[in-house]
Amino acid sequence: MTVLLWLLLPVGLVLATGLATSFYITRRQPRSAFHTPAEFGLEFEEVTFRATDGLALQGCWIPVNGSSMRGHVNGPKRAVIILHGHGGSLDWDIHRAPALHEAGFNVFLFDFRAHGRSQGRLATFGYLERYDVQGAVEFLKSRGIQSIGVLGFSYGAIAAMLSTPICPEVRAVVADGGPARMRTAITVRAVELHLPRWLAGPLTWLAVATTSARLGANLFQYEPVRWVGKIAPRPIFFIHGELDQYVPDFDDLYTAANDPKEAWRLAGVGHTKVSEIYPDEFRRRVISFFDCNL
Protein backbone atom coordinates (compact mmCIF):
# COMPACT_ATOMS: atom_id res chain seq x y z
CA MET A 1 0.00 0.00 0.00
CA THR A 2 2.84 2.40 0.85
CA VAL A 3 4.50 1.70 -2.49
CA LEU A 4 1.22 2.33 -4.30
CA LEU A 5 0.76 5.63 -2.52
CA TRP A 6 4.24 6.74 -3.51
CA LEU A 7 3.49 5.80 -7.10
CA LEU A 8 0.18 7.64 -7.11
CA LEU A 9 1.51 10.76 -5.40
CA PRO A 10 3.36 12.14 -8.45
CA VAL A 11 0.33 11.46 -10.63
CA GLY A 12 -1.88 13.30 -8.17
CA LEU A 13 0.50 16.24 -8.02
CA VAL A 14 0.60 16.50 -11.81
CA LEU A 15 -3.18 16.39 -12.09
CA ALA A 16 -3.58 18.92 -9.29
CA THR A 17 -1.11 21.25 -10.99
CA GLY A 18 -2.98 20.93 -14.28
CA LEU A 19 -6.27 21.68 -12.56
CA ALA A 20 -4.81 24.68 -10.73
CA THR A 21 -3.40 26.02 -14.00
CA SER A 22 -6.78 25.52 -15.66
CA PHE A 23 -8.50 27.58 -12.97
CA TYR A 24 -5.80 30.24 -13.25
CA ILE A 25 -6.03 30.75 -17.02
CA THR A 26 -9.84 30.73 -17.07
CA ARG A 27 -10.39 32.93 -14.01
CA ARG A 28 -12.56 36.03 -14.18
CA GLN A 29 -10.77 39.22 -15.23
CA PRO A 30 -11.78 42.44 -13.42
CA ARG A 31 -12.26 45.73 -15.18
CA SER A 32 -8.85 47.37 -15.38
CA ALA A 33 -9.57 50.64 -17.20
CA PHE A 34 -12.34 53.23 -17.13
CA HIS A 35 -13.07 55.14 -20.33
CA THR A 36 -16.11 56.23 -22.33
CA PRO A 37 -16.60 57.47 -25.91
CA ALA A 38 -17.51 60.87 -24.43
CA GLU A 39 -13.78 61.42 -23.94
CA PHE A 40 -13.56 61.52 -27.73
CA GLY A 41 -16.68 63.61 -28.27
CA LEU A 42 -18.82 60.65 -29.35
CA GLU A 43 -22.44 60.07 -28.39
CA PHE A 44 -23.05 56.54 -27.17
CA GLU A 45 -25.41 54.20 -25.38
CA GLU A 46 -24.44 51.69 -22.72
CA VAL A 47 -26.37 48.50 -23.41
CA THR A 48 -26.89 45.10 -21.87
CA PHE A 49 -27.44 42.29 -24.34
CA ARG A 50 -27.41 38.50 -24.27
CA ALA A 51 -24.89 36.04 -25.61
CA THR A 52 -26.71 33.33 -27.53
CA ASP A 53 -26.27 30.97 -24.57
CA GLY A 54 -28.10 33.48 -22.34
CA LEU A 55 -25.27 35.23 -20.47
CA ALA A 56 -25.75 38.98 -19.90
CA LEU A 57 -22.99 41.08 -21.45
CA GLN A 58 -22.20 44.78 -21.22
CA GLY A 59 -21.73 46.73 -24.44
CA CYS A 60 -21.21 50.21 -25.81
CA TRP A 61 -23.12 51.28 -28.93
CA ILE A 62 -21.80 54.21 -30.98
CA PRO A 63 -24.14 54.86 -33.94
CA VAL A 64 -23.39 57.14 -36.85
CA ASN A 65 -24.25 60.79 -36.40
CA GLY A 66 -27.93 61.62 -36.64
CA SER A 67 -29.14 58.20 -35.53
CA SER A 68 -31.53 57.51 -32.71
CA MET A 69 -29.71 55.92 -29.81
CA ARG A 70 -32.39 53.31 -29.19
CA GLY A 71 -33.79 52.81 -32.68
CA HIS A 72 -32.58 51.79 -36.11
CA VAL A 73 -29.61 53.68 -37.47
CA ASN A 74 -30.04 56.47 -39.99
CA GLY A 75 -27.56 56.32 -42.84
CA PRO A 76 -25.05 53.52 -43.41
CA LYS A 77 -26.28 50.09 -42.30
CA ARG A 78 -22.78 48.82 -41.64
CA ALA A 79 -20.97 48.36 -38.34
CA VAL A 80 -17.67 47.18 -36.91
CA ILE A 81 -17.48 45.14 -33.70
CA ILE A 82 -14.23 45.70 -31.78
CA LEU A 83 -13.10 42.71 -29.68
CA HIS A 84 -10.68 43.31 -26.80
CA GLY A 85 -7.79 41.17 -25.56
CA HIS A 86 -7.56 38.80 -22.61
CA GLY A 87 -7.70 40.53 -19.26
CA GLY A 88 -9.11 43.66 -20.84
CA SER A 89 -12.50 45.23 -21.40
CA LEU A 90 -14.18 47.44 -23.95
CA ASP A 91 -12.50 50.39 -22.20
CA TRP A 92 -9.16 49.28 -23.65
CA ASP A 93 -10.28 49.84 -27.22
CA ILE A 94 -12.62 52.84 -27.10
CA HIS A 95 -9.78 54.95 -28.51
CA ARG A 96 -10.08 52.93 -31.72
CA ALA A 97 -13.71 53.95 -32.28
CA PRO A 98 -13.34 57.59 -33.44
CA ALA A 99 -11.50 56.79 -36.69
CA LEU A 100 -14.05 54.13 -37.66
CA HIS A 101 -16.94 56.39 -36.67
CA GLU A 102 -15.52 59.29 -38.68
CA ALA A 103 -15.22 56.95 -41.68
CA GLY A 104 -18.96 56.29 -41.53
CA PHE A 105 -19.15 53.06 -39.54
CA ASN A 106 -21.40 52.37 -36.61
CA VAL A 107 -19.22 50.92 -33.84
CA PHE A 108 -19.98 48.37 -31.16
CA LEU A 109 -17.72 47.27 -28.31
CA PHE A 110 -18.46 44.91 -25.44
CA ASP A 111 -16.87 43.10 -22.52
CA PHE A 112 -16.39 39.40 -23.13
CA ARG A 113 -17.86 36.99 -20.60
CA ALA A 114 -15.84 36.83 -17.38
CA HIS A 115 -14.36 40.24 -18.23
CA GLY A 116 -15.15 43.77 -17.11
CA ARG A 117 -18.84 44.32 -16.38
CA SER A 118 -20.18 41.26 -18.18
CA GLN A 119 -21.45 38.15 -16.44
CA GLY A 120 -19.61 34.86 -16.40
CA ARG A 121 -16.93 33.10 -14.41
CA LEU A 122 -14.96 31.34 -17.15
CA ALA A 123 -12.76 32.81 -19.87
CA THR A 124 -12.57 30.02 -22.46
CA PHE A 125 -10.31 31.45 -25.18
CA GLY A 126 -12.91 31.51 -27.90
CA TYR A 127 -14.96 28.40 -27.24
CA LEU A 128 -17.83 30.10 -25.38
CA GLU A 129 -16.88 33.58 -26.55
CA ARG A 130 -18.26 32.57 -29.96
CA TYR A 131 -21.68 32.98 -28.39
CA ASP A 132 -20.74 36.44 -27.15
CA VAL A 133 -19.97 37.54 -30.70
CA GLN A 134 -23.17 35.92 -31.94
CA GLY A 135 -25.09 37.92 -29.34
CA ALA A 136 -23.38 41.12 -30.48
CA VAL A 137 -24.39 40.36 -34.06
CA GLU A 138 -28.00 39.86 -32.98
CA PHE A 139 -27.92 43.20 -31.14
CA LEU A 140 -26.67 44.96 -34.26
CA LYS A 141 -29.37 43.35 -36.37
CA SER A 142 -31.94 44.72 -33.92
CA ARG A 143 -30.60 48.20 -34.71
CA GLY A 144 -31.01 47.72 -38.45
CA ILE A 145 -27.41 46.83 -39.27
CA GLN A 146 -27.07 44.74 -42.41
CA SER A 147 -23.31 44.47 -42.94
CA ILE A 148 -20.90 43.64 -40.10
CA GLY A 149 -17.13 43.59 -39.77
CA VAL A 150 -15.10 42.33 -36.82
CA LEU A 151 -11.83 43.82 -35.57
CA GLY A 152 -10.19 41.56 -32.99
CA PHE A 153 -7.01 41.94 -30.99
CA SER A 154 -5.16 38.90 -29.56
CA TYR A 155 -7.81 37.04 -27.51
CA GLY A 156 -10.40 39.03 -29.44
CA ALA A 157 -8.87 37.87 -32.72
CA ILE A 158 -9.25 34.27 -31.53
CA ALA A 159 -12.93 34.89 -30.83
CA ALA A 160 -13.30 36.53 -34.25
CA MET A 161 -11.80 33.54 -36.04
CA LEU A 162 -13.90 31.01 -34.11
CA SER A 163 -17.18 32.93 -34.33
CA THR A 164 -17.19 34.12 -37.93
CA PRO A 165 -17.74 30.62 -39.38
CA ILE A 166 -21.02 30.44 -37.41
CA CYS A 167 -22.01 34.09 -38.02
CA PRO A 168 -23.02 34.48 -41.67
CA GLU A 169 -23.83 38.16 -41.05
CA VAL A 170 -20.12 38.91 -40.51
CA ARG A 171 -18.69 39.89 -43.89
CA ALA A 172 -15.08 40.76 -43.08
CA VAL A 173 -12.54 40.08 -40.32
CA VAL A 174 -9.39 41.88 -39.17
CA ALA A 175 -7.28 39.71 -36.85
CA ASP A 176 -4.43 41.51 -35.08
CA GLY A 177 -2.12 39.31 -33.03
CA GLY A 178 -4.37 36.26 -32.99
CA PRO A 179 -2.46 33.05 -32.15
CA ALA A 180 -2.80 29.97 -34.34
CA ARG A 181 -3.01 27.85 -31.20
CA MET A 182 -3.90 29.30 -27.81
CA ARG A 183 -1.85 26.64 -26.02
CA THR A 184 1.26 27.95 -27.79
CA ALA A 185 0.60 31.45 -26.50
CA ILE A 186 -0.07 30.14 -22.98
CA THR A 187 3.18 28.18 -23.07
CA VAL A 188 5.10 31.32 -24.02
CA ARG A 189 3.45 33.20 -21.16
CA ALA A 190 4.39 30.42 -18.74
CA VAL A 191 8.03 30.68 -19.82
CA GLU A 192 7.88 34.44 -19.28
CA LEU A 193 6.79 33.66 -15.72
CA HIS A 194 10.04 31.68 -15.34
CA LEU A 195 8.63 28.19 -15.79
CA PRO A 196 11.16 25.94 -17.57
CA ARG A 197 10.20 25.43 -21.22
CA TRP A 198 10.44 21.66 -20.87
CA LEU A 199 7.73 21.88 -18.21
CA ALA A 200 5.66 24.74 -19.65
CA GLY A 201 4.59 22.84 -22.77
CA PRO A 202 3.29 19.70 -21.06
CA LEU A 203 1.69 21.71 -18.26
CA THR A 204 -0.15 23.89 -20.77
CA TRP A 205 -1.38 20.81 -22.62
CA LEU A 206 -2.61 19.37 -19.33
CA ALA A 207 -4.31 22.65 -18.41
CA VAL A 208 -6.15 22.76 -21.74
CA ALA A 209 -7.14 19.11 -21.34
CA THR A 210 -8.39 19.80 -17.81
CA THR A 211 -10.33 22.85 -18.98
CA SER A 212 -11.84 20.71 -21.74
CA ALA A 213 -13.06 18.26 -19.11
CA ARG A 214 -14.54 21.08 -17.05
CA LEU A 215 -16.41 22.42 -20.08
CA GLY A 216 -17.38 19.07 -21.54
CA ALA A 217 -15.72 19.97 -24.83
CA ASN A 218 -12.46 19.25 -26.64
CA LEU A 219 -10.77 22.65 -26.73
CA PHE A 220 -8.00 21.26 -28.91
CA GLN A 221 -10.62 21.17 -31.66
CA TYR A 222 -11.35 24.87 -31.14
CA GLU A 223 -8.03 26.39 -32.09
CA PRO A 224 -8.00 29.20 -34.67
CA VAL A 225 -5.79 27.21 -37.04
CA ARG A 226 -8.61 24.65 -37.32
CA TRP A 227 -11.37 27.22 -37.91
CA VAL A 228 -9.86 30.08 -39.88
CA GLY A 229 -10.23 28.21 -43.17
CA LYS A 230 -14.01 28.18 -42.69
CA ILE A 231 -14.26 31.97 -42.88
CA ALA A 232 -13.96 32.01 -46.69
CA PRO A 233 -15.40 33.20 -49.01
CA ARG A 234 -15.47 36.18 -46.67
CA PRO A 235 -12.15 38.05 -46.51
CA ILE A 236 -9.75 38.11 -43.58
CA PHE A 237 -6.95 40.63 -43.03
CA PHE A 238 -4.16 39.52 -40.71
CA ILE A 239 -1.92 42.01 -38.90
CA HIS A 240 1.24 40.49 -37.48
CA GLY A 241 4.36 41.84 -35.82
CA GLU A 242 7.33 39.59 -36.54
CA LEU A 243 8.52 39.97 -32.92
CA ASP A 244 5.18 38.75 -31.55
CA GLN A 245 6.31 36.12 -29.07
CA TYR A 246 2.76 34.83 -28.62
CA VAL A 247 2.32 34.02 -32.30
CA PRO A 248 5.44 32.09 -33.35
CA ASP A 249 3.24 29.94 -35.60
CA PHE A 250 1.71 32.73 -37.68
CA ASP A 251 2.70 31.02 -40.93
CA ASP A 252 0.56 28.02 -39.93
CA LEU A 253 -2.41 30.31 -39.36
CA TYR A 254 -2.01 32.16 -42.64
CA THR A 255 -1.60 28.92 -44.58
CA ALA A 256 -4.74 27.48 -42.97
CA ALA A 257 -6.82 30.48 -44.07
CA ASN A 258 -8.42 30.31 -47.49
CA ASP A 259 -8.65 33.12 -50.02
CA PRO A 260 -9.56 35.92 -49.98
CA LYS A 261 -6.90 36.72 -47.39
CA GLU A 262 -4.13 39.23 -46.92
CA ALA A 263 -1.47 39.89 -44.33
CA TRP A 264 0.37 42.98 -43.16
CA ARG A 265 3.59 41.79 -41.55
CA LEU A 266 6.05 44.15 -39.90
CA ALA A 267 9.58 43.45 -38.73
CA GLY A 268 10.63 44.67 -35.31
CA VAL A 269 7.08 44.88 -33.92
CA GLY A 270 5.72 42.96 -30.93
CA HIS A 271 2.33 41.63 -29.87
CA THR A 272 -0.55 43.92 -31.02
CA LYS A 273 1.87 46.87 -31.21
CA VAL A 274 1.36 47.69 -34.88
CA SER A 275 -1.36 50.25 -34.15
CA GLU A 276 0.89 51.98 -31.61
CA ILE A 277 3.97 52.18 -33.83
CA TYR A 278 2.20 52.87 -37.13
CA PRO A 279 -1.12 54.43 -36.05
CA ASP A 280 -1.89 56.34 -39.25
CA GLU A 281 -1.10 53.42 -41.55
CA PHE A 282 -3.01 51.06 -39.29
CA ARG A 283 -6.13 53.21 -39.45
CA ARG A 284 -5.80 53.68 -43.21
CA ARG A 285 -5.44 49.97 -43.94
CA VAL A 286 -8.19 48.81 -41.58
CA ILE A 287 -10.69 51.41 -42.77
CA SER A 288 -9.86 50.69 -46.41
CA PHE A 289 -10.37 46.95 -45.83
CA PHE A 290 -13.77 47.46 -44.23
CA ASP A 291 -14.76 50.06 -46.82
CA CYS A 292 -14.10 47.56 -49.60
CA ASN A 293 -15.89 44.65 -47.94
CA LEU A 294 -18.85 46.02 -45.97
Describe the function of each predicted region:
Residues 86-99, 112, 249:
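The serine-hydrolase catalytic nucleophile loop
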Residues 92, 123-143:
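Alpha/beta-hydrolase active-site loop
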Residues 97-119:
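Conserved alpha/beta-hydrolase
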Residues 231-232, 237-240:
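Short beta-strand/loop motif that positions the catalytic acidic residue
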